[in-house]
Amino acid sequence: MKANLPTSEYPRVVVVGGGFGGITLAEKLAKQPFQVVMLDRHNYHTFQPLLYQVATGGLEPDSIAFPLRKMFGNQKNFHFRMTRVDRVDTDKQEVITTLGPISYDYLVLATGSSTNFFGNKEIEENANGMKSVPEALDLRSLILQNFEQTHETDNISERDLLMDFVVVGGGPTGVEMAGALAELKLHVLPHDYPELDFNLMNIHLVEGGSRLLAGMVERSSLDAQKALEKLGVDIHFNERVTEFSGRE
């Protein structure tokens, strides 16, 4: 396979990553004398702030995934290739991809971030992250599987485990996820699973610091805390998760 990129009289800017940074740069270069080549493993941009809605069933994936080619369809100097970048050869000014080497005059690495497990391999292996549509769908499936399995057991301890949810991190995503789970508990799941007692469902939000939304003003932190507590979320401050076996 080859990238089959057209030649251009303009310098080539290769942008690795179709996230917020990559698409913002590509938009700014729309009418500039550059050939813009965007590379990404997926052919869509994910609006990550709403992944929690996909994970909890509030939105379908196509509501937050936008085709990159369509986004730049009117930009003649833009070219997209779906590929994985394995390494960069700075001497030859090439990125080595699954489509072969792609030369560049300017290279921008906008690959985004990954879930920070703080070096804890056990948690990394057993916990669920939420940085992509597939991960959000995995979470949705796991949530629903838990309630299906709750139907199938008479073991009280097992039932308690299946109906307990722990969200780690009191930043925007953690707060939104905990709130969405609480809304599910109150308004959605009792209708879908009328045989289950949702008073047994517990939602915990664990935050290593002394308040939620630490990057925001304190008023926002207090408002978020009050809203979650009103929804029945148990918030644990100044605590860190040190072990997770996949069950406890």
Where are the regions that the model predicts?
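FAD-binding core/adjacent interface of flavoenzyme oxidoreductases
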Residues: 1-10, 78-166
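Beta1-alpha1 glycine-rich phosphate/pyrophosphate-binding loop at the start
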Residues: 2-79, 86, 165, 172-215
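Short glycine-enriched, charge-decorated loop/helix-capping segments at active-site entrances
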Residues: 51-57, 124-128, 219-220
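A conserved beta-strand/loop element that lines the FAD pocket in flavoprotein oxidoreductases
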Residues: 75-89, 229-244
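Predominantly flavin-linked oxidoreductase catalytic cores and closely associated redox partners
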Residues: 130, 134-227, 231, 235-237
